[in-house]
Regions:
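RNA pseudouridine synthases
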Residues: 1-353
């Protein structure tokens, strides 16, 4: 099945024992006879609104691997793989300014805004960089070759063809890409660590594990790794570029608004009064939340962070997005051999103008 509005169809394989599958899934009607594909899909996904399935079947939106259109009378076949378009959730309108930083026949680089997810996930399907770009560029083959957190802005790279995907993804997997981020946070409180980050590059090495269902990552510092015989798997070079006075209580960041955002007054660490620092972060690995977790470990969680040091209610705050931007990306083009240097034009809201 082709994409629809930039969104891929979803595959689902019918289980060998539909009754057991319905029982495990907690269906409202686990013992209902399953004679047709429609019977199973209604019982499994929409027992209280079967019209959703029957309407899809009438529109020819549920098909087999070979493109055969299923109907309400199509018999249930264990092991059959079917394809369908997911029901899209109601999504708030997110920023869609994705200026092109670089493009050739193999790859497209854009400057992602804060709050926009890279790919469909959870509550966001249409409102993602991938979906928006597939529609805008008219290219259903676009695929990101790396990821940025939804809250992070900056340089984001997409492969434009199927052969290019493997080449660029391998480049990232082999750590052949130079990456540099900018962040705003409080100065590191430990005098020795702060002095190291001011005079040169402070290296942070930890072990990071992302547990399914947990919002924050689990992290072990170097002494903990040594005690528990764990291997560090996350390394970041941290440099403080400058220290400056934090804005006053009436400061309003010059940050674009977006429809559907819910603002809360003090996301992440408080930023009024005292001092802030501009950090240059160079990750040598690519673990989930690595930069956010490493600055939190140093006692300087990134301003605007709603996950570290503690999880806050999920809400977008356009006046103070996470103060983290993927600022630079450099690599040797795997096809042309050209040295490609990309730089984000995004500005962090808390930096002095």
């Amino acid at each position: 099945m082709p994409q629809r509005a930039g969104i891929d169809p979803v595959a689902f394989t019918l289980p060998n024992d539909p009754g057991a599958a319905l029982d495990i899934a907690g269906s409202a009607h686990p013992n209902q006879p399953v004679r047709t594909v429609a019977d199973f899909l209604v019982a499994r996904f929409y027992p209280h609104n079967p019209r959703i399935i029957t309407d899809r079947l009438e529109r020819g939106e549920i098909r087999t691997d070979n493109g055969r259109i299923l109907t309400g009378d199509s018999p249930y076949v264990p092991g059959l793989t079917i394809w369908y378009y997911r029901e899209l959730p109601e999504e708030p309108q997110l920023p869609d300014d994705l200026p092109v930083l670089y493009e050739d026949e193999y790859v497209l680089a854009v400057d992602k805004p804060h709050f926009l997810p890279t790919t469909p996930r959870g509550a966001f399907v249409a409102q993602t960089a991938l979906t928006k770009l597939r529609v805008r560029e008219g290219n259903p083959l676009l695929v990101p070759v790396h990821r940025l957190d939804r809250a992070t802005a900056g340089v984001l790279l997409f492969a434009k063809t199927v052969p290019a995907r493997g080449l660029f993804q391998t480049m990232f997997a082999r750590r052949e890409v130079f990456k540099e981020y900018l962040a705003v946070a409080r100065p590191i409180p430990d005098p020795q660590a702060r002095a190291a980050a001011l005079s040169g590059e402070l290296t942070v090495r930890t072990r990071i594990e992302k547990i399914r269902g947990e919002l924050q990552v689990r992290q072990w510092d170097q002494p903990s790794c040594e005690r528990e015989l764990l291997n560090p798997n996350a390394t970041t070079g941290v440099r403080i570029l400058t220290v400056f006075d934090a804005p006053g209580p009436h400061h309003t960041a010059n940050t674009p608004q977006h429809t559907g955002a819910i603002a809360h007054p003090a996301p992440g660490c408080p930023v009024t009064g005292g001092q802030l620092a501009l950090y240059r972060l160079r990750p040598h690995t690519g673990k989930t939340h690595q930069l956010r977790a490493h600055l939190h470990l140093l006692g300087a969680p990134i301003a605007g962070d709603v996950l570290y040091p503690k999880v806050l209610p999920p809400a977008d705050a356009p006046e103070l997005p996470l103060q983290l931007v993927a600022h630079r990306l450099e690599f040797e083009h795997p096809v042309t051999g050209e040295r490609v240097r990309l730089r984000s034009m995004r500005k962090l809201a808390l930096l002095p103008s």
